[in-house]
Amino acid sequence: RDDVESRGLGDVYKRQGEIPCYKVAENDKFFAFLDINPLAKGHTLVIPKQEVDYIFDLSDEDLAAMHVFAKKVALAIGKAFPCRKVGEAVLGLEVPHAHIHLIPMQNEKDMLFSNPKLKLTDEEFKAIAKAITMEL
């Protein structure tokens, strides 16, 4: 059996407490949490609670709502971690659950997923999540 639950992000919402998850924001349809292999402090993932592999399989209404939710989170990230812009990326090849990356950036190279990832402690992740949440 090859399903979202057995492979990754799809169940991150359902499996809170079982796997590392630093929540930033949540509503009835979407969940935002820190990427545990961040490119920058504040690198956040936004996912729909609905299990869907490909972001463009979401209904038009849900896709639009996801981007409005992501915008609120991105604005909070930008306040918590001053940057030129908060970049948005949708890749979706490694993780079989639709998600948006929100990454604080000073230049375009900050968005390269081949860049080294930050190694942060549990305390650092908690402080970053709190800083973003306080700006919402």
Regions found by a protein language model. Give the residues of each.
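Single conserved hydrophobic/aromatic residue that forms the stacking wall/gate
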Residues: 1-13
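N-terminal first-folded block
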Residues: 14-58
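Short histidine-centered catalytic/ligand-binding loop motif
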Residues: 45-67, 113-120
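A long amphipathic alpha-helix within ATP-dependent nucleotide-binding catalytic cores
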Residues: 64-81
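A short glycine-rich, hydrophobically flanked beta-strand micro-motif that places a catalytic Asp/Glu
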Residues: 81-93
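A short, glycine/Asx- and small/polar-enriched loop/turn
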Residues: 94-99
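Active-site-adjacent beta-strand/loop module that shapes the phosphate/pyrophosphate-binding cleft
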Residues: 100-106
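Conserved His + Asp/Glu catalytic blocks
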Residues: 107-136
